[in-house]
């Protein structure tokens, strides 16, 4: 693969390799740096500010621009993205924590083009907050290795870690992911249907999200399409926009049932979500909480490790479907050095972690 100019900036002064040189925490290969756990301190933090401003705030003035230039720049670039990704390698439907983790893992291969479809204006799903609108995010070990790879600090406990604010995870993974040249996020865009050819999912039917929500009030609002070699459905649990991928598969007879997720059981749920992440029909992989809907697995509540690892597993399943090296088949770069602690426990484990 040709070298690319995009680089990561370390927390230290040492330069880091280009993004595709970073090794995945999914298959246990070494990564470029680790972030130490947060040390709790009761001292007031100090903020240092530069004594020299890059501009004079008293007399600040922008360079002139024509309004039409702004319009043309936005329109031209978006239309070129639509043309580029009208036929792509992977389409990920849903930009929650599982979908973003999947896209991040896929984007390490610069030869794979990844389009992300998100019906909301703001991607991230429920990963902007922890449970009950609280801010902290709990991640059970060993999924914290993914946080190390992303460079996210956390408070380390015996069997889990806690991120100060869930938004730190979501904003960090998005900032790294969306900077990569082989990824495009189409937010405020809904996947209204699937493209199916000869019993294989071959893409998605798209429309502006606001149009999708108003088909009953307007007429003649036909959709667009996006062909893909692989579709990853990461639509979350059941709801107005949830589990839409598997519900559509049922309605067209490609699967028999969508029983819905069972009551909460964290210790069973997270392992089950990762284990059951798979290609459910030819051309379509299901990841995240949508897995619980199709398999009747328990809901997990406000823990997020399974979303991250399920997304990574979905990425490697997609790589396998594309004929690329992947951790599922063990032919991914340095995959043979998988660390034992990255192999999740069996779903039937009886161990319960209590803070």
From Swiss-Prot:
Keywords linked to the UniProt accession: Chloroplast, Iron, Metal-binding, NAD, Plastid, Thiamine biosynthesis, Transferase, Transit peptide
SUPFAM superfamilies: FAD/NAD(P)-binding domain (SSF51905)
Protein name listed in UniProt: Thiamine thiazole synthase 2, chloroplastic
Lineage: Eukaryota, Viridiplantae, Streptophyta, Embryophyta, Tracheophyta
GO annotation terms (biological process): thiamine biosynthetic process; thiazole biosynthetic process
Catalytic activity: [ADP-thiazole synthase]-L-cysteine + glycine + NAD(+) = [ADP-thiazole synthase]-dehydroalanine + ADP-5-ethyl-4-methylthiazole-2-carboxylate + nicotinamide + 3 H2O + 2 H(+)
Cofactor binding description: Binds 1 Fe cation per subunit.
EC number: 2.4.2.60
Gene Ontology molecular function terms on file: cysteine-dependent adenosine diphosphate thiazole synthase activity; iron ion binding
Functional summary from the UniProt entry: Involved in biosynthesis of the thiamine precursor thiazole. Catalyzes the conversion of NAD and glycine to adenosine diphosphate 5-(2-hydroxyethyl)-4-methylthiazole-2-carboxylic acid (ADT), an adenylated thiazole intermediate. The reaction includes an iron-dependent sulfide transfer from a conserved cysteine residue of the protein to a thiazole intermediate. The enzyme can only undergo a single turnover, which suggests it is a suicide enzyme. May have additional roles in adaptation to various stress conditions and in DNA damage tolerance.
Modification note: During the catalytic reaction, a sulfide is transferred from Cys-220 to a reaction intermediate, generating a dehydroalanine residue.
Cofactor(s) listed: Fe cation
Keyword flag Iron: yes
Modification type 2,3-didehydroalanine (Cys): residues: 220
Highest taxon, organism lineage: Eukaryota
InterPro entries: FAD/NAD-bd_sf, Sti35, Thi4_fam
Binding partners and assembly: Homooctamer.
The organelle targeting sequence, given as a residue range: 1-72
PANTHER family, per database record: THIAMINE THIAZOLE SYNTHASE, THIAMINE THIAZOLE SYNTHASE 2, CHLOROPLASTIC
Family label: Belongs to the THI4 family.
